Design a protein with these regions (language model features):
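C-terminus-biased signal that marks the final domain/tail of proteins
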Residues: 1-180
């Protein structure tokens, strides 16, 4: 494998990178024992290459998924622009061959989304904790709705990014002299 190799009879290995083109999904678990279980666990989840996605907050108490992560009709061979895997994969596959040109646009959108999620987290969780003290199910619903909203927001921004990349970097862009 590319992670293990031999040179002059000596064996070497590389650690597996966290961001590779064959990644189907990845997540970062954020676990806080000082919060109630329903609030303390978040999976920062994303479909496709870890460097080319915006991780969205999925609270561990969620009981429903955003449609973009459970899209009827979408599968490994059926594209859907309502499906996060397909849209994120579409964008990544546009970026790979022209990484130095396209990645800065992707990074700007990715960082904008993630920074907004991180900035909102204290307020969102303060509200959830307040709800939790009087109505546990209301707190769970609030976080579930928040996760779905942020998942849908990510998908919408990624679709916009895909269209932007196609228009800005199409093979005619240099000839027209216009930047879209």
């Amino acid at each position: 494998t590319p992670l293990q190799y031999e040179v002059d009879g000596k064996k070497y290995f590389n650690e597996r990178p966290t961001s590779t083109q064959q990644t189907g999904f990845s997540y970062v678990a954020q676990l806080r024992s000082w919060l109630p279980r329903e609030l303390g666990g978040i999976l920062w989840f994303g479909n496709d290459d870890g460097n080319m996605i915006a991780y969205v907050p999925i609270y561990c108490s969620n009981t429903e998924r955003a449609e973009c992560f459970n899209t009827p009709g979408a599968d490994a061979v059926t594209f859907s622009d309502k499906n996060a895997f397909w849209v994120c994969n579409w964008v990544s596959n546009m970026v790979y061959p022209r990484y130095s040109q396209l990645f800065p646009s992707l990074k700007a959108v990715r960082d904008s989304l993630e920074n907004a999620y991180f900035a909102a987290q204290p307020e969102v969780e303060a509200k959830a904790l307040s709800l939790y003290k009087t109505d546990k199910s209301a707190a769970v619903k609030y976080l579930n709705d928040y996760s779905i909203q942020k998942s849908n927001e990510m998908l919408a921004r990624w679709k916009q990014l895909a269209i932007y990349l196609i228009v800005k970097y199409n093979d005619m862009a240099g000839e027209t002299g216009k930047e879209s």
